[in-house]
From Swiss-Prot:
Part of the 50S ribosomal subunit. The keyword RNA-binding applies. Binds the 23S rRNA. It comes from the Bacteria. Belongs to the bacterial ribosomal protein bL31 family. Type A subfamily. Keywords: Ribonucleoprotein, Ribosomal protein, RNA-binding, rRNA-binding. InterPro entries: Ribosomal_bL28/bL31-like_sf (IPR034704), Ribosomal_bL31 (IPR002150), Ribosomal_bL31_sf (IPR042105). GO terms for cellular component: ribonucleoprotein complex; ribosome. GO terms for biological process: translation. NCBIfam families: L31, PRK00528.1. This is Large ribosomal subunit protein bL31.
Length: 73
């Protein structure tokens, strides 16, 4: 294999929406950094049966709805 082709993996902390912290190996950030998730499998409608609503933290959902409001979505 070629040297210095792939980034180095290190352990980071991933903070779930319920406050739980999970250690994972990743190329994101630096060793020991914490990645806080806005949405994870415990609250995502795809894994919870669709009953939960997504939080519109970045305004993307409302922007999409406004753009396509005449199509009846």
């Amino acid at each position: 294999m070629k040297k210095d082709l792939h980034p180095e993996y290190h352990v980071i902390n991933v903070k779930m929406t319920n406050g739980d912290v999970v250690e994972m190996r990743s190329i994101w950030g630096a060793e020991g950094d914490t990645l806080a998730l806005d949405i994870d499998p415990t609250v995502h409608p795809a894994w919870t049966g669709g009953g939960a609503r997504l939080l519109d933290t970045g305004g993307r959902v409302s922007k999409f709805k406004k753009k396509y409001e005449g199509l009846g979505f």
